[in-house]
Amino acid sequence: MPEQFGQYGRHRFWEMIPGILTWGTFLLAIGTSLFIPWVAVIYIIIFDLYWVLRVLYFLIHVSAAYRKYRNTLKVNWMDEVKKIADWRCVYHVVLLPTYGESLEIIHEALHAVANSTYPNDRFIVVVGGEEGDEENFENYRLMLEKDFEGTFKHLMFTMHPKGIPGEMQGKGSNLKWMAGKVHEYIDAEEIPYEDILVDAFDVDTIAHEQYFAKLAHLFLTEDKPLRSSYQPLTLFSNNIWTATAPVRISSFGTTFWLLGELVRPERMWTFSSHSMPWQMLVDVGYHEPDLVSEDSRIFMQGFLHYEGDYRVTPVYLPVHMDAVEGETFWASLKALYKQQRRWAWGVEHLPYMIAEFRKHPKIPKRLKRRFLFNHLEGMYTWTTAPILIFMLGYLPFFVAGDTTSALIANAPFSLERMMQVATIGVFASGLMSFFFLPPRPKGVKKWNWGIMILQWAL
């Protein structure tokens, strides 16, 4: 069993690396700008060129993934599943951890499962509450039991206790508790582990009606299906029409990032709501209960347990979720910042991979290098690129002032041209976002279409 790393400080040096790289880059950019600006200019040109190439590379993959997405939407996957012998052996265990959500949100998630094209008698649905939210949980539990009585093969409710040693209160620890409880039911029903898929969803997840059928089809046709997690396309579209413009831009950005990753499964981790084999979840001892980003860690747990023989298979169908919201514009921005900070919490995974990879000599070194580089490069550019390009990029020219250096004199024009090329990504994202928009709700005015267009000026 891999060591749990949620209790920070055990591997302090490796925990410091993301911060050292980020702040070291900023200090280096400021220092060279003040004392040797021509060096800073060269660095900025190289970095901007790298960013432009990355944008173009990103657009190629997003375009390819979008075509696959559109083609997948055209297929009736339940009809395809029925062509496979013994397809009814596949069960879905849907895990919905909750904390403080309204009855409406949970009801919509269950309703989406009930209205999927996959047979309801092949669903085991688990709604997990927290002891700290017990009163709210018990109130909606009675209503949900009444509304969905007899709908699924089994609907169960669990209550995750507070204060379990080694845990932090969060989605991961609740998922671990829920898995343990449904494990007892699965054993009692004598359902073979290899016939079960687990859908670990955020509670606001509205799965596409064909998602579970498509997933079952993949599970029945993929090579070594028990050695793969399954990643859908995440659309933060449930409330996209009422979210603030910065939140909408960020939400679409996350969707396009994941869309580009789907066509490169060799570098993928799982993200947010996704699915996995029950056998894998049991083999690794469920989700780790003491960290923030359990959604991606569970993939690495499987990768380590199976000595690198574990992957992510893309599912080119969407699951719809809520974009972050607040009562005011600034509250929404604060919630967005906290969400992005949680996703970018690279200090959890880097020390974990470095320490665990050393314990697994059977994993090919090329795979270890790939995951380490992709993770570190992704976290690094995420934190540094916006500030380097749009803020510190101007500093060396301001310090240099009027100069006879041809490099410094001509660099702004070169950088301007590169940024103009990079804006292709913005225009492409803006155009593509309209294909992912849900129908305009009745309470939203028509002029909001104009805001949907103008927001990309941000």
PLM region spans:
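Long, acidic, intrinsically disordered low-complexity segments
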Residues: 1-3, 119-131, 407-420
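N-terminal membrane-anchoring/stem segments of glycan-assembly enzymes
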Residues: 1-83
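Loop-to-transmembrane boundary segments
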Residues: 3-21, 89-106, 363-387, 454-458
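Membrane-embedded multi-pass helical conduit in multi-pass membrane proteins
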Residues: 26-55, 375-458
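Juxtamembrane/interface segments at transmembrane-helix termini
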Residues: 56-76, 106, 265, 288-293, ...
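Structured alpha-helical bundle/scaffold domains in large eukaryotic membrane-trafficking regulators
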Residues: 64-75, 190, 352-359, 395
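Internal catalytic domains of large membrane-associated glycosyltransferases
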Residues: 70-348
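Long, K/E/R/D-enriched contiguous segments that form extended
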Residues: 230, 314-316, 320-322, 327-406
